[in-house]
């Protein structure tokens, strides 16, 4: 499990990997958060539940990262923990463990939007990998 952040013109490209689809999605969300906040080992103050409509893995990735952007922009919270599970219908359910945005030092600009440019989700041997570009 892990992620890598790569500069991409005026954007940010996130590559994530894990042994499961859900793990890969969670790693991408962690990667997005680490691009703008120094989460370290900060404990969550509370949880925020989310759901994503059923769809193929690339669309679930966009929906999940859109949820991160929403929580940051609309609620001024930063996810420090991500829990993701697939629903029987093929969607997602989960929780973000969050803290107030002001409680963590910024390390970069907050994301503005998740794009579908260069969006990829694929199986690579025993692991799942994804790539997504985020407008910062």
Question: What is the meaning of each model-derived region?
Answer:
Residues 1-136:
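N-terminal intrinsically disordered, cationic/polar leader segments
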